[in-house]
Amino acid sequence: MAPRIPSIPSSTDLSGQSALVTGSNTGIGFENARQFLQLKASPVYLAVRSVERGQEAKKLLLDDPEVKKKNPGAVVEIYQVDMASFDSVAAFAQKFSEVKKLNIAVLNAGVSFFKYIPTSDGYETVLQVNYLSNALLATHLLPLLKAGAAASGKPSHLAFVSSNMQHMTSLKKNTIKPNENIIDWFNNRANFGMDRYNVSKLLLTGFTNELASKIDSSQVVINSMCPGLVATNFDTNSPWYLKYLMKGVRSLMARTPSEGARALTLAAITGTEGNGKYYSDGKETPSAALLLTEDGKAFQKKLWDQTLERIQQLDPTSPPPI
């Protein structure tokens, strides 16, 4: 059995705070939104690919007995975004900016594929959805989060859903040559591997580390976390033999979506001591060993610089994060 994720402190009260959760019409994103509502957050924004499914999720959330009891005036709003399209992310960001301020953002949307599938933007899907689009969206959300902090007098929170799979990649010290662009290297079909999901979470954690080191934690607390193995349909795109294997593993070890979502909620309510941290099982833990070495830190810095440059190329309206 997986270690138990700590309970959310009973004193937690998110009254007057707004929260955004991406990928929130199902699974741990849905349960994370439910937990925010039960903690009295409002409005809670669901950023989803399908508005119809988002509306179904909204009804389920507002019909939840505990939400009705603890947060009877709760507001849930639906926004459409497809993380496999940079234009969609930019359009969502522009529309969402109308809220003016935000207190909590949990970037949960992600995918897993075991074959190279390009998006309409010409990027490998897992690289784009799990990494580049999350980085792009984060730059758009930071001004809103800073405004939320200024209005509330306490730090806002930006939490990225990562994974312990970042510890298991084929990436080594000299895998990518100094003169090679990291994003282009991973976007090259010849460099695609079965560990692409793992790599995407390594990149996301590296970006999170750099971002957290550059933003004042009294304004925005930034961190990442792993919810662990959760009983969801996340492996829909896996080969049949992996689905069969994971079905057995999940029956023995998987957390419920509600339990997994607690990891997201806990990361999103930490104090400033949680800035730049990586959490697993609801507890602070080291990120991938590669990122902790001097070479890894240099890789992380290079990734940061090249990601910001690429984001500006993809979406010139993206505000500089620092």
Curated annotation (Swiss-Prot):
<feature type="binding site">
    <location>
        <begin position="230"/>
        <end position="232"/>
    </location>
    <ligand>
        <name>NAD(+)</name>
    </ligand>
</feature>
<keyword id="KW-0520">NAD</keyword>
<dbReference type="GO" id="GO:0016114">
    <property type="term" value="P:terpenoid biosynthetic process"/>
</dbReference>
<comment type="function">
    <text>Short chain dehydrogenase; part of the gene cluster that mediates the biosynthesis of sesquiterpenyl epoxy-cyclohexenoids (SECs) such as anthrobotrisins and arthrosporols, metabolites that possess a novel hybrid carbon skeleton consisting of a polyketide-derived epoxycyclohexenol combined with a terpenoid-derived monocyclic sesquiterpenol substructure (PKS-PTS hybrid). The SEC pathway plays an important role for fungal soil colonization via decreasing fungal nematode-capturing ability.</text>
</comment>
<feature type="binding site">
    <location>
        <begin position="104"/>
        <end position="106"/>
    </location>
    <ligand>
        <name>NAD(+)</name>
    </ligand>
</feature>
<comment type="pathway">
    <text>Secondary metabolite biosynthesis; terpenoid biosynthesis.</text>
</comment>
<protein>
    <recommendedName>
        <fullName>Short chain dehydrogenase AOL_s00215g274</fullName>
        <ecNumber>1.1.1.-</ecNumber>
    </recommendedName>
</protein>
<keyword id="KW-0560">Oxidoreductase</keyword>
<dbReference type="Pfam" id="PF00106">
    <property type="entry name" value="adh_short"/>
</dbReference>
<feature type="binding site">
    <location>
        <begin position="197"/>
        <end position="201"/>
    </location>
    <ligand>
        <name>NAD(+)</name>
    </ligand>
</feature>
<dbReference type="GO" id="GO:0016491">
    <property type="term" value="F:oxidoreductase activity"/>
</dbReference>
<feature type="binding site">
    <location>
        <begin position="47"/>
        <end position="48"/>
    </location>
    <ligand>
        <name>NAD(+)</name>
    </ligand>
</feature>
<dbReference type="InterPro" id="IPR036291">
    <property type="entry name" value="NAD(P)-bd_dom_sf"/>
</dbReference>
<comment type="similarity">
    <text>Belongs to the short-chain dehydrogenases/reductases (SDR) family.</text>
</comment>
<keyword id="KW-0521">NADP</keyword>
<dbReference type="InterPro" id="IPR002347">
    <property type="entry name" value="SDR_fam"/>
</dbReference>
<feature type="active site" description="Proton acceptor">
    <location>
        <position position="197"/>
    </location>
</feature>
